[in-house]
Amino acid sequence: TGLVSALTLAGMAASIIGARLCLGNGRHRIISFVGMASVIVAAVSSLVLGAPVWIALGCLFIYNVCIMLDSGALTAGVVSVAGEGDRGALLAVHSMVGFAGGSLGAPAVGMMLDFGGGGDRLDAWSGALLIMGLGSALVALIQWRAWRRHGFAV
């Protein structure tokens, strides 16, 4: 439970830090960079699962932080572009899109675990981490396109 508590607290801090980073550096830019960092850390994590446990856990801890860095920034971005009377509806749609991503991600990870021979095999978990990284790559691409569309200024 101590490890899970540390992951949760680090994720909460990362979410706040990510939102703060976006204030002065551009939301799309930061989320795009964080998404690509998540892809890289997911790939590295998939390669070190067979390493000593402290190395694998360290990489997975960093991956957790990378994943959480953009959550506050995405929510703050939704609130900042919503009109006064539309915030509730826009946040509801934002939440639904997030849950839809989660509902697609879990079966994709499960499928990779099955294809890899089951949850007790490291190579199956490596594939699962790569699938999670693919989700981060998709978010990074969407944000990068938005950043380019806004002239690299947002």
Protein language model features and the residues they cover:
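Residue-level signature of mid-helix packing/kink "hotspots" within the transmembrane helices
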Residues: 8-16, 103
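Helix-to-loop junctions at the C-terminal end of transmembrane segments
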Residues: 14-27, 113-114
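A membrane-interface helix-boundary motif in multi-pass transporters
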Residues: 111-134
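Intracellular helix-loop hinge segments at the cytoplasmic ends of transmembrane helices
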Residues: 73-81
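Loop-to-transmembrane helix entry
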Residues: 1-9
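A late C-terminal transmembrane helix in Major Facilitator Superfamily
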Residues: 81-117
